[in-house]
Amino acid sequence: MHNLEQKTARIDTLCREARILPVITIDREADILPMADALAAGGLTALEITLRTAHGLTAIRRLSEERPHLRIGAGTVLDPRTFAAAEKAGASFVVTPGCTDELLRFALDSEVPLLPGVASASEIMLAYRHGYRRFKLFPAEVSGGPAALKAFSGPFPDIRFCPTGGVSLNNLADYLAVPNVMCVGGTWMLPKAVVDRGDWAQVERLSREALERFAEHRRH
């Protein structure tokens, strides 16, 4: 079993430095490099590549090899087999939409840190029993949003979250006002229409704006 405390520390460092994790779904292989470059130019250098399309693992592999300065993670990992494939492709972290006992146990034996998805106290307790203390609240908005995060801080004072799902510029301040939020995940810097037309300059602008707003709210 790899040291879970060390992997938790790596998640902490990732979230502290990243601040915002863009959640990326690759529909065209040709978009992989220019999209990542645009996000990075805007300051977003840790990317969660979802495995929702056939290009997900390819994107992780290519970016890990061709953009080694970026931190590339795998998202939408649903089972141990997919976790292993993401690790083999070069993912430096793994994010799941939910958690199962099988997946939590499997990840304990991997060098790659896992950020498990949770939406309830019961799911937190399941992962907590295995030693996990850092979570993705997903889908954040429909799971109670900032109010749920505040409520979780009572029985679970030592856990921290990366809320994802419904987080946007409009409600970013509400999430960042909650002390147990360490970073946020989102897609708002990658509007579908913008990506479809390959407007990478706009992706860069939206990424920079997102980080500026994050810094503004975390100062208060």
Swiss-Prot record:
* Keyword Repeat attached: no
* Any one GO MF annotation of this record: (4S)-4-hydroxy-2-oxoglutarate aldolase activity
- Keyword Lyase listed? The answer is yes
The catalytic site is made up of E48, K136
Alphabetical GO biological process terms: Entner-Doudoroff pathway through 6-phosphogluconate
Catalysed reaction per UniProt? 2-dehydro-3-deoxy-6-phospho-D-gluconate = D-glyceraldehyde 3-phosphate + pyruvate
Q: Known InterPro entries for this protein?
A: Aldlse_KDPG_KHG (IPR000887), Aldolase_TIM (IPR013785), KDPG/KHG_AS_1 (IPR031337), KDPG/KHG_AS_2 (IPR031338)
From what superkingdom does this record's organism come? Bacteria
Q: How does it assemble?
A: Homotrimer.
Question: Any idea what this protein is called?
Answer: 2-dehydro-3-deoxy-phosphogluconate aldolase
Species of origin reads: Pseudomonas aeruginosa (strain ATCC 15692 / DSM 22644 / CIP 104116 / JCM 14847 / LMG 12228 / 1C / PRS 101 / PAO1)
Q: Which gene encodes it?
A: eda
